Amino acid sequence: MSASATNGTHYEQLHQGRTKMYKSKVDVVLGAQWGDEGKGKVVDMLASDVDIVCRCQGGNNAGHTVVANGTEFDFHLLPSGVVNEKCVSVIGNGVVIHLPSLFDEVLKNEAKGLQHLENRLIISDRAHLVFDFHQHVDGMQEAEKGGKSLGTTKKGIGPAYSSKATRNGIRVGELLGDFNLFSEKFKSIVATHVRLFPSINVDVEAELARYKDYADKVRPYVKDTICFLHTALRNGKTILVEGANAAMLDIDFGTYPYVTSSNCSIGGVLTGLGLPPQTIGEVIGVVKAYTTRVGDGPFPTEQLNDIGDLLQTRGFEIGVTTKRKRRCGWLDIPLLKYTSLVNGYTCICLTKLDILDTLPEIKVAVAYKKPNGEKLDHFPGTIAELGNIEVEYAVLPGWQTSTEEVRNFKELPENAQSYVRFLESELSVPVRWVGVGKGRESIINVH
């Protein structure tokens, strides 16, 4: 056999080994709009059949509500899948963690019946820490902006990611290492922030004493999650990733600067967990049957009228994290086409269809136009351009009957089915599930 043939076979063997090294795939649940689409409920439904559920980015600025066995759980840092006692929950390296909030969240949910968390929660040693002074800075920066505030949650997420990007952040693993080194780094990062924000007051010694206690509390949960996840994939374990926030809040692809400080699109899954692209299986886009957003920023289909009020009231549109009323508007197809382009949805879960039950007609945005009437063939890249567009709507007939008790797609009113099919045809993405209520039992399997 010639050397070239041998080399070719050698290459093919190695190449085949690389392409077949994982026995399972990672399925991903991502918000397709501005958040609050109902991702937690979808994750809760899917988590009953998986081995591992992961958070990959964001912090306790996210808010997910899950109803399990009649009990309502609110999660901010913990993955929603933690209610399933058979699966392991992972907080990945891309997440920023405020330890006081994490342990408060654990206590509150344990009081509601969450059990045995110590055996099934894993935290990455590479995840960065959010400190109280990050939160103070967040509030101060928002206050300084006055009427031009970004509407952040003031949870310190942006300042913590800033510390990470400027390479003076502190990771969980450093808290668990030599505490003298941690103390030095902590004093250094405090000094930097005091220099930039002289009005913040940090009792360094008190904070160090507090974090010495947190080191002992968090130690049992901390692992190299990258190694853990790759081993799991090689062994055929099923993994589900729960994206926090949503595509239109992504630091790169969202309505910048009215965005969060992390990548909440598909790229953040890879960098936030240390996974290669070939591990990704299903990408499930969660779409609310109408559109909402919390805080400031452009919102082309917003309804500042009776329709907006009705959606807000019927949908109980109040932020889990901020307690602010959510702004409400019609479903936006150009926005969804854009986020589908970025994320590559393989299927969609449409949520809160029941909120539209009382409407005689329903509008859906189908195109954006420039002021001169010319249709846009792309999603605007600046808020100035987005704020200057006109929206073209399709008007669909409503169904004016309750869908809350329906559990079979074919039993939905014909016009409700048509609404779902319209979304499918516009996006060329199949709708796999439709939600018509709060609990996991209210999710209809379409196919």
UniProtKB/Swiss-Prot annotation:
It catalyses: IMP + L-aspartate + GTP = N(6)-(1,2-dicarboxyethyl)-AMP + GDP + phosphate + 2 H(+). Its EC number is 6.3.4.4. The active site is at residues 36, 64. Pathway: Purine metabolism; AMP biosynthesis via de novo pathway; AMP from IMP: step 1/2. Substrate binds at residues 320-326. GTP binds at residues 35-41, 63-65, 326, 352-354, 435-437. One of its GO terms (cellular component) is cytoplasm. InterPro entries: Adenylosuccin_syn_GTP-bd, Adenylosuccin_syn_Lys_AS, Adenylosuccinate_synth_dom1, Adenylosuccinate_synth_dom2, Adenylosuccinate_synth_dom3, Adenylosuccinate_synthetase, P-loop_NTPase. It is found in: Cytoplasm. IMP binds at residues 36-39, 61-64, 153, 167, 245, 260, 324. Homodimer. Belongs to the adenylosuccinate synthetase family. Plays an important role in the de novo pathway and in the salvage pathway of purine nucleotide biosynthesis. Catalyzes the first committed step in the biosynthesis of AMP from IMP. NCBIfam families: PRK01117.1, purA. PANTHER family: ADENYLOSUCCINATE SYNTHETASE (PTHR11846:SF0). This is Adenylosuccinate synthetase. The lineage of its organism: Eukaryota, Metazoa, Ecdysozoa, Arthropoda, Hexapoda.
